[in-house]
Amino acid sequence: VNAQPKPPASVQALIVIDMQSAFVSGRGAVPDADRLLDTVGDLMARARESGALLVQLQNDGEPGAPDEPDTPGWRLHLPVDAGRGEVVLRKSADDGFEETRLEKVLREAGVTALALCGVMSEMCVSATARTALDLDFRVVLPHDAHATYDIPAAEGISDAVPAAVVSRVAEWALGDEIEVAARACDVGFTKP
């Protein structure tokens, strides 16, 4: 129901969620991380070329977590171009708006429509999307630009659930207000 049959209208900002080394490289990488990195990297390049606002959210994990601050896993895996005014916002909750300047940054730039990408589909991507919708932003979620882990089997509950299914269920659960683009390459960008 919420998959768009045609490419969505252009957006003015790209929010890159938790593309940190712990989640996209090495043993802890989400399944198909190389494809995700290519897809998100392409989105970032196209956002930069168009003059759209680019914000990277960086999760501050708990002590001992793979994304604990100032550890190799915490580092953003894709480069930030500070010379273009790109913004990095640290967060400690799933929701990228909670106790961050994200709403202020978007409003001050004049953004009304944004695209989200990154990890984890059912956690930080979903929570950030829900708040963006609640704040009346138009939200586009490219189906191939977010990811998560497989859910392991739970005896008496379910078999294992593949990561791709978890991601699809997460985007479906966001309802009809979100625009799900089938492919990230269909998302267009414009200046705010």
Please give the residue ranges for each predicted region.
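Short, solvent-exposed loop/turn segments at secondary-structure boundaries
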Residues: 27-31, 66-69
